[in-house]
Amino acid sequence: MPQPRRSKVGDDIRSSARERAVHFLYEAESRSIAVSEVIKAQILPVDDLVAELANGVELKREETDELISEFSHTWTIQRIPAIDRNILRLAIYELIERADVPVAVVINEAVELAKRFSTEESGKYVNGMLSAIAKRVRV
């Protein structure tokens, strides 16, 4: 009998930071509040990397959303499930602002988050979108 697929997400500090940042981004969007408010409301301390990622995505949201809209072709950004949209935003932010993180790592982490929190199909969608976007923003 095959073993269930183990997620690679959460295997290290950076992976955990990405996951927590996506949760904060999703909550902020769902509640129509700033991500800084979500961070302030946390009982447990928020790691610096989590705050940097979540706040950075919020600052670059217009730019990331333009890229998502451009590369999603037939889908409007609002039609993309909220969790997938926020995973894409985080990954695109990293592609643009964190040149120290290899493209393959950014894409793999995003795909794993999509598979874990959305659907297998979302993982494929995220992979295709980010592969195309990476060719544009990481020349």
Sequence positions of predicted segments:
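N-terminal interaction/assembly modules
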Residues: 1-123, 127-139
